[in-house]
A protein has these predicted regions:
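N-terminal targeting/secretion presequences
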Residues: 1-356
């Protein structure tokens, strides 16, 4: 195989075939088993390709494939990306491979115990949940179908659970995963952790975060995110004092977003932290990565039930003379253009009203 180096060892491998048709280039495998194997696949872009004409028309039907205590690692060219999977006990049934078309399908997957490691090797590691360096343990996946052809993946996950090195524990994950060379789609994803329950839909162009002519990210989210999970994802972006005093209630999130970092539209986006605050926003935010060029036009309704958790952010001489009352409400339209802010609003607290 051009540009591929495969090495490692296999403890035990067995195949049972009751139908090999050489004339039709077709193999019927009843059972296959791989045990105590450690295989490394290294892809290289420096090896000249084999230009000898050859075509592989073989097709393989596989009834059952068992993997036990085995590992498979893949290293991309230049070792920019590496992925390692560990199978404690896995079973795949009703598989079909067409080597000429590059078509691979599996009817059922039952992966019970193992792990997965994903590393963007030239990206620095960060605290919390690190998208570039994932390490999943106690991994269990039950899938009803898997399809791969022409860089298109379609996977239907019936049930999955795992632990991530950051501390994230996923008790249940269900949904469909679709991806090709241009787009990623999660049409109906549901997942829960000990402190969170979320249902979401997402469709994203893979160039959605490009600087020039970016694609579109579209997502709809409904659920509640527990404090521990929230801090894994945004804790590093918050001031330490605020992260310490953040209330221990789940953050309720509902709404839709569509756009990219150049311009993001919000539709019915609602954030609610019980006994603390609630906020609903519609409109857009633009130039998200350039604070000096930030623009927004938002219809905003917010109620602050209690803002005591932000007091550590204020200087002591301020908190000694100023008290932030409970029950502040704000309704208005907010404009931001760089360092300039403007709003037409009504703010109320108790029996008082301020208009601007």
């Amino acid at each position: 195989i051009d540009n591929v180096c495969i090495r490692g060892h296999v403890g035990q491998m067995s195949l049972k075939a009751h139908g090999i048709d050489l004339s039709r280039e077709h193999v019927k495998l009843n059972d296959a088993m791989l045990s105590d194997a450690d295989i490394i696949v290294e892809l290289s872009d420096t090896v000249p390709p084999d230009t000898t004409p050859s075509e592989n028309f073989w097709k393989i039907n596989l009834d059952r494939l068992k993997l036990r205590n085995s590992a498979l690692a893949v290293h991309m060219p230049g070792d920019t990306l590496s992925v390692k999977t560990i199978f404690t006990n896995a079973l795949a049934t009703q598989a079909y491979f067409d080597l000429y078309k590059g078509l691979y399908t599996v009817r059922h997957i039952d992966w019970d115990g193992g792990g997965l490691r994903y590393d963007q090797n030239y990206e620095p590691a960060v605290r919390g949940f690190d998208y570039n360096h994932l390490l999943l343990a106690a991994l269990s996946i039950k899938a009803d179908s898997f399809y791969y052809c022409n860089s298109r993946i379609d996977l239907k996950v019936r049930q999955a659970m795992f632990r991530e090195k950051s501390g994230l524990v996923v008790d249940s994950l269900r949904g469909r995963f679709m991806m090709d060379s241009l787009k990623l789609a999660l049409p109906d994803l549901k997942f829960s952790t000990p402190g969170s329950q979320v249902r979401m839909k997402m469709a994203m162009d893979l160039n959605a975060f490009d600087d020039i002519r970016p694609g579109i990210l579209e997502t709809e989210v409904h659920g509640a995110i527990g404090r521990q999970d929230l801090m894994l994802f945004i804790g590093n972006a918050l001031p330490r004092a605020l992260a310490r005093t953040w209330p221990r209630y789940p953050l309720v999130v509902n709404g839709k977003m569509r756009g990219n970092l150049q311009k993001m539209h919000l539709s019915g986006l609602t954030l609610k932290l019980p006994k603390t605050f609630s906020m609903t926003a519609d409109g857009f935010v633009a130039n998200l990565t350039s604070p000096e060029r930030l623009r927004s036009d938002l219809n905003l309704y917010a109620t602050a039930h209690s803002l005591k958790f932000i007091l550590p952010l204020l200087p002591r001489d301020v908190t000694n003379v100023i008290r932030i009352p409970d029950g502040i409400a704000f309704k208005g339209r907010v404009h931001v253009y760089g360092s300039r802010y403007g709003s037409r609003f009504v703010a109320t607290q108790g029996g008082g009203t301020v208009r601007g």
